[in-house]
Amino acid sequence: YINEIEWYRDWQLQSPLIIKKSRHGAGSKLPYNEMPIGKLIRSSSVSPKHGGFLYRLAKWLNAKYILELGTSVGISTMYLSGAQPHAKIVSLEGDCQRALPTGLDRLPTLDMVFFDGNHSAEPTLRYFKQCLGHIHNNTAFVFDDIRWSNEMYRAWQVIAQHSSVTVSIDLFSLGVVLF
């Protein structure tokens, strides 16, 4: 399945389609409002290495209920659904502050959450706290781009030291917490 995802990524990298970007959260470090889908994939999508990590973690967790904050073009969603084809996945793109309560209502619990929708500390911490009410002892949260900025790294440190967290793993650009 991973080979199919990477074939799709390669195919989309060549696409002439232009995507209109909307700004949510800290946004992108790229100044463009419109860009070719290939450029968006290169700048915003999960890498093959991190996609493989998400795939293996979802499989290992046997995750049935997965929440993703920050869909972009859906590459990470494909890794998650490939690992767990029968899982219920809610993937949010855009204004997560408005969409998160509805997304949480659609899942009875959270087995895995991938946070990649905002690179600002305050919203990231708020989303983390909102999701805490839906965890169990085998839930895993994965945070992308924990070193995207000093602010994001400080948010990661607060999350890693939260009293509900039993294990935190700093993978430099990804952070994982277990409960």
Where are these regions (language model features)?
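A short alpha-helical cap/connector motif
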Residues: 1-114, 118-142, 146-178
